[in-house]
């Protein structure tokens, strides 16, 4: 599983209810993660933001 420095996070789409699960390094990335990924419901690339 993930090590001590890594945290499992949820990425939520800004335009739909689609979600991705990923891990991030807490030491290197202190702020909230924001990635552009493919949304399967909308069938296009949108911004996904870190959600708790």
Swiss-Prot record:
It comes from the Bacteria. This is Large ribosomal subunit protein bL33. One of its GO terms (cellular component) is cytosolic large ribosomal subunit. NCBIfam families: PRK00595.1 (NF001860), rpmG_bact (TIGR01023). Belongs to the bacterial ribosomal protein bL33 family. GO terms for biological process: translation. The gene is rpmG. GO terms for molecular function: structural constituent of ribosome. Keywords: Ribonucleoprotein, Ribosomal protein.
């Amino acid at each position: 599983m993930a090590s001590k420095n890594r945290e499992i996070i949820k990425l939520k789409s800004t335009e739909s209810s689609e979600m991705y699960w990923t891990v991030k390094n807490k030491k290197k990335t202190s702020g909230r993660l924001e990635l552009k990924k493919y949304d399967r419901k909308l069938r296009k690339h949108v911004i996904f933001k870190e959600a708790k």
